[in-house]
């Protein structure tokens, strides 16, 4: 027993020394910021619970607006000027919340979140639920947890009057999970805010590496699409491969797709044919991602269509892929003809030197707070997000929100302690950037 007490005493002493070392790396004001965050850890989770219990699926505009009103009240209390940005009614989207304050001190910051979730009103997951040491709920980590981190980081700074004379804009979009169309309209407010800012921080959830360490995102691949249309000569199947009948549309489509696989691939570039239809008669509606086909085994296919996505990290990479794909499509088999068209959706967030400097500043804040270094997540491990629309204009850092698992599934959850950790890191980073 005495040995156990001695071991506990040594451990307590070591922890105290580590805490003292971390505190020594922070200024007196920064130590007060950390204390202010910790003081509200319980209240932050309570606020998060209230927002999670309001359904805000993208296609539930009133629910999105209600969650927006909850966050708007918090920003109003912190002295921000707030407004709701409506979108055209035909888009059937709720709109966006914007909160801003203007000053002349330090960098002008843009903080990005979103109010909507993938959990619509008919989802079986509707409420906050404790599961052991985890919390389960719709949007608890993607991304109402990130939104709460933004509010609580700013609240800690406001307590010390550290927001005075700073320029900070917060944009919470209401349709991140399923954006309205056209994107030029739905993301106009976000782009406008970026053009008035120096740096942007996105609070999507943190992704852990293979060793279980927190990372941050300095690059995200673009999301774009392609449509392949092939025509062949309809004829009796006995003549397939002949000079007069040719190979048909399905063989040509298969040749093209396989050539894409063999000749176009490179690191950080992916292209996935998500749907394909072929036969004598085909129809495909890209608006609803559905198609149909009619054909007989004794008739050479006259039509083939395939739709896919293309994800790339830089525009140079996109252009190389487009050129290779067009060259493959142009080399048609006898009796067939093909064409390919491309469409753009989310622009790339390339891993620029400015993004890397932001990561270094964020990692240093984390180290100084005793929370460990933060490494960059490989871009191929994240999907598309709102931060990509501002990446062409400012240096960006994303993925600095909460830690959770099962995003976009009925098992989406949150590690509760990650809210406090991420809030401390964010508050210190914002404080240092705005001095």
Predicted regions and their residues:
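Extracytoplasmic/secreted envelope proteins and their assembly/folding machinery
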Residues: 45-49, 68, 72, 151-154, ...
